[in-house]
């Protein structure tokens, strides 16, 4: 049985459809990331799951029980769902301990014991318990918000872009710590984000949302390497898209012959490669004949660790852009050999 099931969820505001027949299953103890651009409907979907809003159609099932099905509506505070908002939303007039313990029942001793357990769980120094929210760092504030959400022993944790306000280094470390914590506690979770890297690294199930629909749902590696369509491919990362003629397990394209992930397709198709699949080797003139594909570097856009190279394929004159790790031996006018690792992905007809 799934922890959460969404069946044909629909939602409109006046004449604007925000969610269009959303179906999603969240397995027990799993981490799901819903990723999409601003305005795609992901936050509205999260609010419907939490019980802050009701859908116009569909069913929300939590651990086999209907939270909403058109006749049944269970309010947010009775769903057993934890919620961590984007800014943490800590109570400024409560200490760290007061925030974590908000809503806990029992004796003062029991509350203190539970607060200490939760602080240990989210790796917060107990000495912070008497401090006010403004006296601790952004990363610590997010851990307090998570501890407060965990205090009620939720069956599902919802995370609404909780790392977006943190700096890059802190965002990555906090994200990893939260993912490990939720896994250890065996709590299913849903992260909403517009950051593709965050979604791919946090989740074991990624759902790409576009214009109120889930375009593709599956494991992160599947979505990255075998996306359902070109918009999903480009949204999840840098790509090289090429038109090719297919036959006998190979694509004949501007880069020469490339292995493909569907050897049975024939005819013309669009194929995709990720930048890390393409290896560039600077060549001397006497090495040209041994290269499977020759290209000339006609422009370099340096951006620190990564550079964008504009290459002109010598055999066809076609130009392509690829991103690669910046190297001192690459310069405009250089002739390079291109080699492809792995298979190109063929998009469905």
Curated annotation (Swiss-Prot):
Protein residues bound to ATP = 36-43
A GO molecular-function term, please? ATP hydrolysis activity
Q: What is its main location?
A: membrane
Q: Name one GO biological process term.
A: transmembrane transport
Q: Which PROSITE patterns match?
A: ABC_TRANSPORTER_1, ABC_TRANSPORTER_2, FBPC
The subcellular location is:
Cell inner membrane
Q: What function is annotated for this protein?
A: Part of the ABC transporter complex FbpABC involved in Fe(3+) ions import. Responsible for energy coupling to the transport system.
What's the Enzyme Commission number for this chain?
A: 7.2.2.7
Cite the record's note on assembly: The complex is composed of two ATP-binding proteins (FbpC), two transmembrane proteins (FbpB) and a solute-binding protein (FbpA).
Reactions catalysed according to its record: Fe(3+)(out) + ATP + H2O = Fe(3+)(in) + ADP + phosphate + H(+)
Q: Which residues form a coiled coil?
A: none
Q: How does it sit in the membrane?
A: Peripheral membrane protein
Q: Which organism is it from?
A: Yersinia pestis
Query: Which residues does the UniProt record annotate as the domain ABC transporter?
Result: 4-236
Q: Which family does it belong to?
A: Belongs to the ABC transporter superfamily. Fe(3+) ion importer (TC 3.A.1.10) family.
Pfam families (UniProt xref): ABC_tran
Alphabetically sorted, this entry's keywords are: ATP-binding, Cell inner membrane, Cell membrane, Ion transport, Iron, Iron transport, Membrane, Nucleotide-binding, Translocase, Transport
Descriptive protein name: Fe(3+) ions import ATP-binding protein FbpC
The UniProt entry's GO CC annotations, sorted and at most eight, read: plasma membrane
């Amino acid at each position: 049985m799934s922890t959460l099931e969404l069946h044909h969820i629909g939602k409109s505001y006046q004449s604007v459809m925000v969610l269009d027949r959303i179906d999603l299953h969240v397995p027990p103890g799993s981490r799901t990331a819903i990723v999409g651009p601003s305005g795609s409907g992901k936050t509205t979907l999260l609010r419907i799951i939490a019980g802050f809003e009701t859908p116009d159609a569909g069913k929300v099932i939590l651990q086999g029980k209907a939270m909403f099905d058109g006749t049944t509506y269970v309010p947010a505070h009775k769903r057993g769902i934890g919620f961590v908002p984007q800014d943490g939303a800590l109570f400024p007039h409560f200490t760290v301990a007061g925030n974590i313990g908000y809503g806990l029942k029992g004796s003062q001793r029991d509350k203190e014991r539970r607060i200490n357990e939760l602080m240990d769980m989210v790796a917060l120094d107990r000495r912070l318990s008497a401090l006010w929210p403004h006296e601790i760092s952004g990363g610590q504030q997010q851990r307090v918000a998570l501890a407060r959400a965990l205090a009620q022993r939720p069956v599902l944790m919802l995370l609404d872009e909780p790392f977006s306000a943190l700096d890059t280094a802190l965002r990555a470390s906090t994200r990893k710590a939260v993912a490990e914590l939720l896994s250890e506690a065996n709590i299913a979770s849903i992260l909403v984000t517009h950051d593709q890297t965050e979604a791919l690294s946090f989740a074991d199930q990624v759902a790409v949302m576009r214009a109120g629909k889930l375009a593709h749902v599956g494991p992160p590696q599947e979505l990255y390497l075998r996306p359902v369509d070109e918009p999903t491919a480009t949204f999840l990362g840098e790509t090289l898209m090429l038109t090719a003629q297919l036959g006998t397990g190979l694509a004949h394209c501007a880069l020469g012959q490339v292995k493909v992930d569907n050897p049975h397709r024939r005819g013309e198709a669009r194929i995709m490669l990720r930048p890390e699949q393409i290896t560039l080797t600077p060549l001397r003139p006497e090495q040209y004949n041994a290269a499977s594909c020759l290209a000339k570097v006609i422009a370099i856009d340096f951006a620190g660790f990564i550079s964008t190279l504009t290459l002109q394929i010598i055999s066809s004159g076609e130009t392509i852009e690829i991103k690669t790790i910046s190297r001192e031996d690459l310069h405009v006018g250089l002739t390079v050999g291109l080699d492809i690792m792995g298979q190109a992905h063929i998009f469905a007809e």
